[in-house]
From Swiss-Prot:
One of its GO terms (molecular function) is transferase activity. It holds the Pfam family Pribosyltran. May catalyze a purine salvage reaction, the substrate is unknown. Keywords: Purine salvage, Transferase. Its EC number is 2.4.2.-. The keyword Nucleotide-binding does not apply. Belongs to the purine/pyrimidine phosphoribosyltransferase family. Archaeal HPRT subfamily. This is HGPRTase-like protein 2. The keyword Lyase does not apply. GO terms for biological process: purine ribonucleoside salvage. It is an enzyme of class 2 (transferase). InterPro entries: HGPRTase-like (IPR026597), PRibTrfase_dom (IPR000836), PRTase-like (IPR029057), Pur/Pyrimidine_PRTase (IPR050118).
Amino acid sequence: MDQLRRSLQDAPIIEKDGYHYFVHPISDGVPMLEPSLLREIVIKIIRKASLENVDKIVTPAAMGIHISTAVSLMTDIPLVVIRKRQYGLEGEVALFQETGYSENQMYINDVEAGDRVLVLDDVLSTGGTLKAITEALGDIGAEVEDVVAVIKKVGGENKIDASPYAVKTLINVDVVDGEVVIVDERGDG
């Protein structure tokens, strides 16, 4: 995890409404995402995730897309993007996403009862997004085989902790005194 660790330690911190954010290529698209960093992350995801029975990778728009696309290309597992736009297609399922900084309606298409899915996201912070997604997938009747987030920001309430799903992460960090501190460079799971 050398590149991921270094890139997080070098990440600028911004404050918005009392919440401290790191600005990182994986979570924000800035600064520029180097292919070698993305490759390192994808290899770690493939090694950590339980993929044997997965039919589909499911990821929320927008910052899970680049990671999930790369994993899909490497594994030949189809990708479903949960969108913030409603299309009104048959079988579309709405979910309500609440994070530390926003509330949104999101929409799942192309997931059906019996599908076995990997849920993949960029950052686990409050757990609001992953909780909403896993609940909606359960309501559809899909089987959540695994849940992976690249980066976990520790501290504070994490809504996914109360769910039946254990989220695997690649690295766990905190923001202390305006800097990213690596809490566990191997993550959870």
